[in-house]
Amino acid sequence: MLNTLPDLHRSFAEQLKLKLQSDSRIHSLLAGGSFIHGGFDQYSDLDFVVVIDPLYYDEIMAQRMAFAGTLGHLLHAFTGEHVGEPRLLICLFGPELLHVDLKFITLDMLTQRVEEPAVLFTRDNDALKRQLAKFCAHWPNM
């Protein structure tokens, strides 16, 4: 799945996956956007959903800027309140520019989604499948 990405994107995604797999507080890593819809090129951003164990959600949300800084040379990051999504961290990495969106949620929060994500890793595939099956993705009415 990751092998179809441009080198910069693939390298970042692989590094993120390894980092999150080694963190027992993380339940799953999901991908969305052009990663699943197609049309991905060297100018595309990466859209990730980081599913967190609810026991650690507040802790990780409080540390998400610092966490993003461990993923590479973070040029700038800001939260997504301006797009109505405060759980979103919008990141720009460099020196070769890479836009990465990290959305931090718990498994229960997967009920509200705009697309069916790709699963990059999960600690409990059955629980993830059950949660995804409860609700279908839909765009909000604007």
Identify the function of each model-found stretch.
Residues 1-29:
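Helical scaffold of the NTase/Pol beta-like nucleotidyltransferase catalytic core
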Residues 1-5, 68-142:
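Conserved NTP/Mg2+-binding pocket subregion across the NTase superfamily
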Residues 15-18, 32-38, 74-78, 86-90:
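Short secondary-structure capping/turn segments at boundaries of alpha-helices and beta-strands
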Residues 21-23, 40, 83, 94:
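A generic structural signal for short, solvent-exposed coil/turn residues
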Residues 33-63:
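Catalytic metal-binding acidic patch
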